[in-house]
Design a protein with these regions (language model features):
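Charge-rich, low-complexity N-terminal segments
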Residues: 1-110
Length: 110
């Protein structure tokens, strides 16, 4: 099995829809670090699991300089964003979404 990971920094904004009062319910932004983990039993015709630039382009296109609430139909928590990103990237099995130094969410396919 081959494994690769790609780390991408994105500047994004969102607001959370919560059942309790929180600063996160208001529009705010993050300089998030997204780490995408991909795997494959075989390499493609170029000798890769996936091209790192493809992963970067996908993640940047989804999130960078975006108001994420306009792009998704779910509550854009770090956990949900990690799952959403994982679903978009070829051969992805795990995503870590770090919205700040201390707040990190991970989604991993079973």
């Amino acid at each position: 099995m081959y494994y690769v990971e790609k780390r991408i920094e994105v500047a994004m904004a969102h607001r959370l829809c919560l059942t309790y009062e929180s600063k996160s319910s208001h529009l705010h932004g993050h300089n998030a670090i997204v780490t995408v983990y991909c795997k494959s039993e075989t390499l493609n015709e170029n000798g890769m699991v996936v091209d790192f630039s493809t992963v970067k382009d996908i993640v940047k296109g989804l999130l960078d300089h975006q108001y994420v609430n306009d792009k998704v139909d779910f509550n854009p928590t770090a956990e949900n964003l990690a799952r959403w990103i994982c679903e978009q990237v070829p051969n992805c099995y795990k995503v870590t979404f770090q919205e700040s130094r201390d707040n990190i969410a991970t989604y991993e396919k079973e």
